[in-house]
Amino acid sequence: VSRARMTSPDPIDLAGRILEKVAELHAAGKKDAAAALRVEMTRDDPALFALVYLRRHLTDTETQRVTLSEVHLAWAEIARQWASSEPRRDAIIAPRSMGKSTWFFLALPMWAAAHGHARFVAAFANSAGQAQAHLMTFKRELDGNRLLREDYPGLTRPMMRRGRPLADSQDMYIAEGRFAFVARGADTGNLGLKIDDARPDLIVCDDLEPGEGSYSAYQAEQRLTTLLDDILPLNFRANVAIVGTTVMSGSIIDQFRKYHDEQEAAAVRNLDCGSSHVETVAL
């Protein structure tokens, strides 16, 4: 199977061909070669990683067909750049039921952790319970996903001390290979969050805001202060993905949208004035 980037015209087909080749290698008694193929083909390709290792999470429960849209490929392209030396910050705005949590709390951090592109993930949600539920899904894959356990034992086995897991709780997991995942509510005390001397190198915020019925402009301002003063300063060199849905006018996600629209309008005005310079803004 030839190497292909996630921009392959049909990543679902490519993943299927990889799995067929893996089955052939297993049938020939070449288990190590099968594992090496999976690892090598997914090293730089988050979408392919999800299709190979987390296929059931991308399968429609009614049709039993694997589903993948252009937006999922765009999200995978964002994550692929986490492997570079230059950190990036992105705000992703999407309606509900688009798979935001599946990709940003499971598939993309799992890919980054498996291939060493992230060593310490700090994940935040509106409440501690939400964040912990996502970490539980992540840990269930580590415990029960046969392919992950075969190919990435240093990720799937918890770090042990005196015969007991060092950190395998509702809000924290530390792997044998020293990867760490911490899940917190937005208003949980987060100042100075670090493990030994390590600070988060990937910060994910998913649905950081509650629904409009329990949210006000004052609360939005308070939550923005938490984001700017407590969460982002955990590591200014970390990759950051802030994912959410616009819950009301003036919410944090809505402010991202307005800022983006203003920058696009400014670029258009520059073109109208004959300027040759157009500035693009990464949220």
Label each PLM-derived region with a short phrase:
Residues 87-108:
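Walker A/P-loop
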Residues 167-227:
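Conserved RecA-like ASCE ATPase "motif II neighborhood" in helicase/translocase motors
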Residues 1-88:
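N-terminal accessory segments
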Residues 222-240:
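Substrate-engagement module of ASCE P-loop NTPases
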Residues 124-189:
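Conserved nucleotide-state-sensing and coupling region of NTP-binding domains
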Residues 252-283:
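Conserved P-loop NTPase catalytic core
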Residues 92, 108-125:
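Glycine-rich phosphate-binding loop of nucleotide-binding enzymes
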